[in-house]
Amino acid sequence: ALVMTQTPSPVSAAVGGTVTISCQASQSVYSNNLSWFQQKPGQPPKLLIYKASTLASGVPSRFKGSGSGTQFTLPISGVECDDAATYYCQGTNTGNNIVFGTGTEVVVK
């Protein structure tokens, strides 16, 4: 079964700095179908990145996805207070099963 393991929480980030969240898949993600989501308390997840590196509509270019196969990263540059949230990667295996990562909380200081 596909397992997505992320950078352990919490991760501390300074305003204006850069933070990178990693996501490791236990097997190759099918066709690079890897997405990143941002979730804040009481809100539904917001899609940031799909197909590993494609920015979703309306998402600032400070968010950049990269990687392929089993290793993926989400660097956030120019960190803002509003970036404080929990971030999830989501992968798809060859059976089209969708699997979420463990989640990484980003704390902005």
UniProtKB/Swiss-Prot annotation:
Disulfide bridges in this chain: none
Region (Complementarity-determining-1): 24-35
Database matches in PROSITE patterns: IG_LIKE (PS50835)
UniProt entry keywords in alphabetical sequence: Adaptive immunity, Immunity, Immunoglobulin
Region entry Complementarity-determining-2, spans: 51-57
CC terms in the record's Gene Ontology section: immunoglobulin complex
Region (Framework-1): 1-23
Spans annotated as Framework-2: 36-50
One Gene Ontology biological process: adaptive immune response
Residue span of region Framework-4: 100-109
Organism superkingdom: Eukaryota
PANTHER family linked to this entry: IMMUNOGLOBULIN LIGHT CHAIN
More about this protein: This chain was obtained from antibody to the polysaccharide of a streptococcal group a variant and was isolated from the serum of a single rabbit.
Protein name: Ig kappa chain V region K16-167
Provenance organism: Oryctolagus cuniculus
